[in-house]
Design a protein with these regions (language model features):
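Bacterial N-terminal signal peptides
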Residues: 12-25
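N-terminal secretory signal peptides that target proteins for export/translocation
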Residues: 1-9
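Extracytoplasmic/secreted proteins, especially bacterial periplasmic and envelope-associated proteins
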Residues: 52, 56, 60, 81, ...
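A ligand-binding cleft/hinge motif common to bilobed small-molecule-binding domains
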Residues: 103-112, 171, 176-180, 207-241
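N-terminal (or domain-start) structured segment
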Residues: 30-120, 158-160, 166, 182-211, ...
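An extracytoplasmic/periplasmic, membrane-proximal ligand-sensing/linker region
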Residues: 2, 35-37, 180-181, 220, ...
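Hinge/capping helix and adjacent helix->loop/strand transition within the periplasmic-binding protein
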Residues: 88-94, 101, 108-195, 244, ...
Length: 329
């Protein structure tokens, strides 16, 4: 009897010590982090919108963490190459991903990948969000969404929309619009946003649903017209453009969000430190201004809030894939 009690107490003490040592180890790791250069892996090519935002974040983190923070571009496979690379990196916070809706919701909803967007990552925090913007070629006569829907219904199949490729955010947004309104339009996929935008400007396609981040320069320059924001609220960047919901089109909302992710099993203390310095960087007025100038709104979050966002978005877009019968290439 006494021997059993002694063994029970010994087991409890050992468990308590193990938990205590684990917490202590995490705290020590957090205090010593970073011990070397940090790399932010960007899943798109250099010179694009994601790249510009990541470099802005890298500069702020470097100043606050006291170590170089560089950007490494690993474009391809709609973000899967970069995501898989970071998922397999050492879980110490020195290699992190500038992820976005494609890497952690749309691409995984569309097809089975060699990484899990939830299980293989520790969310650090949101960086920004850019609502989807419905833009049309200047020759399209519609001045608002009701007129556009009426035109498309009057001539089914006569309108075509451009996307950055099959399974990309603009493709998903357009299919969501089709499901909600019942319009019939042809999908013309391109290899990237740039040629899709240019052909919409030129009139090869009549409309597109890119992020405001992507379309803002063309709308500002008068090359495209914005008919509505595919988001829950108006944007501070383009406050005069109404949402689709304001124009009577419900259940069509898509915000293209961006954030940082660490590999799974990165210590909580390290993730929390990165989240703290990321949010401090995003609170700087010059950073907010530069992000807004490119057509996005600064958004911050805790790691847990971002994890919940990823889970919600993944569930939602899997439903859209099934309803619209979207297939991967």
């Amino acid at each position: 009897m006494g021997s059993n009690i002694s063994k029970l107490w010994a087991a409890r003490i050992a468990t308590t010590l193990a938990v205590g040592l684990s917490v202590l180890a995490g705290t020590v790791q957090g205090q010593s982090f970073p011990s070397k250069q940090i790399t932010i892996v960007v899943p798109t090519a250099a010179g694009g919108a994601n790249d510009a935002m990541a470099r802005l974040v890298a500069q702020g983190l470097s100043q606050r963490l006291g170590q170089p923070v560089i950007v490494e571009n690993k474009a391809g496979a709609n973000g899967a190459i970069a995501s898989e690379y970071v998922a397999q990196a050492a879980p110490d916070g020195h290699v992190i991903l500038f992820g976005y809706i494609a890497t952690h919701a749309i691409n995984p909803a569309l097809q089975k990948l060699r990484y899990d967007p939830v299980a293989d990552f520790e969310p650090i925090g949101l960086v920004a969000a850019s609502p989807t913007l419905l833009v049309v070629n200047n020759s399209v006569k519609a001045k608002n969404m009701q007129e556009l829907v009426a035109l498309m219904k009057a001539k089914p199949g006569s309108f075509s929309y451009a996307s950055a490729g099959n399974g990309t955010a603009p493709h998903f947004a357009a299919e969501l619009l089709k499901l909600s309104t019942g319009v019939d339009m042809l999908h013309v996929p391109y290899k990237g946003s740039a040629p899709a935008i240019m052909d919409t400007i030129g009139g090869t396609t009549q409309l597109m649903l890119p992020s405001l981040f992507t379309a803002y320069p063309q709308v500002k320059g008068g090359k495209l017209r914005a008919l509505g924001l595919v988001g829950d609220k108006r944007s501070a960047v383009m406050p005069d453009v109404p949402t689709l919901a304001e124009q009577g089109i419900k259940n069509v909302s898509m915000s293209q969000w961006y954030g940082l992710f660490a590999p799974a099993k990165t210590p909580k203390a390290v993730v929390d430190r990165l989240n703290k310095e990321l949010n401090a960087t995003l609170a700087e007025k010059n950073v907010v201004k530069k992000i807004e100038e490119q057509g996005a709104d600064v958004e911050t979050s805790s790691p847990d809030q971002m994890k919940s966002l990823v889970q919600r978005e993944l569930t939602r877009w899997r439903g859209v894939v099934a309803a619209a019968k979207i297939k991967a290439d």
